[in-house]
Every structure is written in structure tokens, then in C-alpha cells.
Amino acid sequence: MNPRRKNRLILVMLVLVGLGLATALVMYALRSNIDLFYTPSEMVNGKGEQQLKPEPGQRLRVGGMVMPGSVKRDPNTLRVAFKLYDASGVISVSYDGILPDLFREGQGVVAQGVLQDATHVIAKEVLAKHDEKYTPPEIEDAMKKDHPAQAVGDNSVRPS
């Protein structure tokens, strides 16, 4: 092989290795920024056809209704614990911070944080649902399936 071809081959190989390394580093960095959305049912029963459940330590978002009577506030700190539910699942959430003004029992919320164990999330952010037109599609679909009267805003029908 003549020296010119050899140098060109080495240069091409170095560029390919560099691109591969850069791609691997970018993918590794972005991996920690992925937040998957779950409902309480999906956390308890699994998500999708393969019934995949989130693993402890995984970052996620969970959306559901705040269970009436479940909100517990620490009088000395901003720590709040509450439960989220839907048709077939209940999970507990701990949050240390100021809750949104619209947060209340029976209200739809989305908690973003880290899964501590199978049914407990330590939230870093809590968002309260305030209007149907601002609801993410996956939450709207889950709420229509689990709570049809509440999801479409029909206040005349209340579950007993």
C-alpha cells in the first residue's frame, strides 16, 4: 500500500472512531434527561404489552388524581406526602416544596421525580391540572379511560 493511501485510511479510521465516541458520549449524557410518563396503574401492573415496570432510581413522571384524605403535611417543614390513584392503581408521593395553588384532593396532578421503590415516588416537581386544553394527550387518554365523567368536565355525574 502506498503511503498516501495509508495516511488517508488512518485519517478515515480516526474520524470514524471520533464520531463513534462523540455519539456514545451524547447518548450517555441524554440518557439521564429522559423522563417516562406513567399512570398509577402502569406503575403497579406494568406498561405496554410486555408489562414493563419502572425500576427504583429511575426518573419518571406520574399522573393521576390526588386521593381524598391522603394529603399529609409536616407542620415544621414544607414536606408533603399524598397518594395518586386511577382506576386500578395507587402510589404514594413525597414532595418537599411549595405545592401549586390549584393542588387539592380529587384534583389531577403530575409529579416528576425519582422512583424510590415500586409504589413510592420522591417528587422534585408537582404540577396541578388546571384546564383540559392544557393536558398532555397521554394524561387525557388515561383520565378519560379511568374517570370518563371527570375527564370531559361533566360535573352532573359524580361517582359515589
UniProtKB/Swiss-Prot annotation:
GO molecular function annotations of the record: heme binding; metal ion binding
Ranges facing Cytoplasmic side: 1-8
Membership in a protein family: Belongs to the CcmE/CycJ family.
Domain of life, per lineage: Bacteria
Keywords linked to the UniProt accession: Cell inner membrane, Cell membrane, Cytochrome c-type biogenesis, Heme, Iron, Membrane, Metal-binding, Signal-anchor, Transmembrane, Transmembrane helix
GO cellular component, one term: plasma membrane
Annotated positions binding heme: H130, Y134
Chain residue ranges for the region called Disordered: 133-160
Primary location group: membrane
Transmembrane annotation, as ranges: 9-29
A Pfam family it matches: CcmE
HAMAP family: CcmE
Membrane topology: Single-pass type II membrane protein
Function of the molecule: Heme chaperone required for the biogenesis of c-type cytochromes. Transiently binds heme delivered by CcmC and transfers the heme to apo-cytochromes in a process facilitated by CcmF and CcmH.
Positions in the Periplasmic compartment: 30-160
Localization in the cell: Cell inner membrane
Comp. bias regions, Basic and acidic residues: 133-148
Name of the protein in question: Cytochrome c-type biogenesis protein CcmE
GO process annotations (BP): cytochrome complex assembly
